[in-house]
Amino acid sequence: MIPRTALSALLYASTSFAVCTKLEDCPQFEALKTDECQTYHHFLARGSTSPYPGHVIETVGKVCNALNTKENPKACGYEDVQYWAMNGGERWCISSHEGAMNGAEQMRNYTARCPDSHLIVMGFSQGGSVALDVLGGGGGPLWGCTQEDNPPMNISSAPGSKGATLIFSQLLGLN
């Protein structure tokens, strides 16, 4: 279970509006990108057509600022969920499925290497859909295409039992 401090940091950070999307435009966050074992490790799923790491990097920075301490300055970091991040019909379905499969595999690999880490999954826009599909399974018809199925994570075992999720999205189709 992630301690209250981490959850408080997540909730606090979720109120910020992220504007930095490209890592080269945000050098202050470069040190957070790692695949090394950490106490808290984010998996970021960017929005459609966004560059890596995407819209949630500033939120990750705030969360990590709250979790990194003098005693453990590298307690928190992130890695990008690797996927195409494209929109529009069939491209969305292919991209989302790729993200869900890759995100789940990245989390499994990380947990195998770093079994004591707490996992935080963050997604924005299409990345929010990818994050939900990673954790809960996905697939089916959407916007004129059919996304291939992917299985949900087992919440009784790692990595499914080790995560917290934060999704940023927009409501679609509301008039």
Whereabouts are the PLM-identified features?
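Broad hydrophobic/π-residue packing in well-ordered secondary structure
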Residues: 2-3, 44, 81-88, 124, ...
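Generic low-polarity alpha-helical segments
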Residues: 1, 13, 67, 164-167
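Fungal secretory targeting signals
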Residues: 1-20
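Conserved beta-strand elements of beta-rich interaction domains across eukaryotes
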Residues: 13, 49, 171-172
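Active-site catalytic motif of lipid deacylating hydrolases and related acyltransferases
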Residues: 21-118
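Glycine-centered flexibility motif
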Residues: 2, 47, 99, 136-139
